[in-house]
Amino acid sequence: MPYPAALHIVPRGAARGSSTVVFVHGSLDRGESFRRVMRRLPELTTLAYDRRGYQGSRAGGIVGLGGHVDDLLCVADAAREDSGAPVVAVGHSLGGDVVVAAALASPHTFGAVGVYEPPMPWLGFRRAQTGTAGAWPPVSPDSGEEAERFFSRMVGPAAWSRLTDEGRAQRRADGPALVADLRSLHGEGPPFDVTQLEVPLVVGMGGPTTRPHHRRTVEWLGAHVSGAVVYEIEGAQHGAHLSHPDHFATLTRLVVDRVPTAAR
């Protein structure tokens, strides 16, 4: 079964008989951001992909959360058909929302799932109203401007300034997909009920310096999702897959270890 033609797949080798890990990136990111993590998992079959509308998958058009869920389920089905082994999905940031929603829609597809600091504003844990990490302003009607604003807010204005002209242009080109992501999470009601999740779950978060609303969300998930395991990466903040790839690889192994024996 082929992978969806509209998606740019980032594979990292294959380990015969092992589980397959599918990494799902967050907003204004790309599959390549997991490359350092995947290099640290030689015993597993791993792949990532650019979500539809981002980077190498821009030609696939713009979709909301439901479209990203459909894509992940197609990728997971293709991976399982290729290997015959269990598939687990690990999502960073909004990629975690995609993973949870997919596992709710099709529990039999995944042996286990992992998420790192998934934004779930409907739980009531929001960014602080004061300081540099203030609440999100309304989405800009200019998607390129929204991409610049999002990047500067998440990484820092200085980091935006350090990008090359091409780097800034690439982020702006991802603006329409970013806007669709933001609107997916800020609708009239919750897009899913995470407490109904039946697939084994590992929830990752950064250390004390990560943003408080991320920690509160992860702590809530650990307390309210049956059987969920919380894994803290000391010293990490939101971009742990980039800054702490060894620890993110450990989180991934925890997810694989949670696959029920009967499913292996």
Q: Predicted regions: what is each one?
A:
Residues 143-180, 186:
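Conserved alpha/beta-hydrolase catalytic His-Asp/Glu region
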Residues 26-29, 93, 207:
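Active-site glycine-rich loops that stabilize anionic/oxyanionic intermediates
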Residues 3-58:
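Conserved HGGG/HGGXW glycine-rich cap/lid loop of the alpha/beta-hydrolase fold
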Residues 170-224, 229-232, 240, 245:
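Conserved serine/cysteine hydrolase catalytic core
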Residues 100-141:
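Flexible "cap/lid" loop of the alpha/beta hydrolase fold
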Residues 91-95, 99:
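Gly/Ala-rich beta-loop-alpha elbow adjacent to hydrolase catalytic centers
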Residues 38-39, 45-88, 250:
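Active-site loop/oxyanion-hole signature of alpha/beta-hydrolase fold enzymes
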Residues 226-264:
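Catalytic active-site module of serine/aspartate enzymes centered on a nucleophile-bearing elbow/loop
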